[in-house]
Amino acid sequence: MSNIIKQIEQEQLKQNVPSFRPGDTLEVKVWVVEGSKRRLQAFEGVVIAIRNRGLHSAFTLRKVSNGVGVERVFQTHSPVVDSISVKRKGAVRKAKLYYLRERSGKSARIKERLGE
């Protein structure tokens, strides 16, 4: 039974997911349904957490919009997610960047990772 489940999950995995780490700035394009129309909506933010669970993998992005912090969790292999692109690579030393929630302004900046 578990072989069948693994095979089905393997078929549903997306192949075009770029590699990214916490601290990186990503732009995620998501399909949004408004009435009878479908359109792409972009969300750009810093990766503050990654959850690696195969088909159930997810990552959390954070951005500050009009002075308000906005966090959004995306399922990596969801059909709602159209594309993921890495805009900037960040140099951090932790896997979870929840400390950015209490910071604002210059203290919330992340250094850029060079040499990769």
Swiss-Prot record:
Q: Which Pfam families match?
A: Ribosomal_L19
Note the coiled coil stretches, chain numbering.
none
InterPro entries per the UniProt record, alphabetical: Ribosomal_bL19 (IPR001857), Ribosomal_bL19_CS (IPR018257), Ribosomal_bL19_sf (IPR038657), Translation_prot_SH3-like_sf (IPR008991)
Q: Which HAMAP family match?
A: Ribosomal_bL19 (MF_00402)
Please report which protein family the annotation says this sequence is part of: Belongs to the bacterial ribosomal protein bL19 family.
Q: Which PANTHER family match?
A: LARGE RIBOSOMAL SUBUNIT PROTEIN BL19M, RIBOSOMAL PROTEIN L19
General function of this protein: This protein is located at the 30S-50S ribosomal subunit interface and may play a role in the structure and function of the aminoacyl-tRNA binding site.
Know the name of this protein?
Answer: Large ribosomal subunit protein bL19
Q: Which gene encodes it?
A: rplS
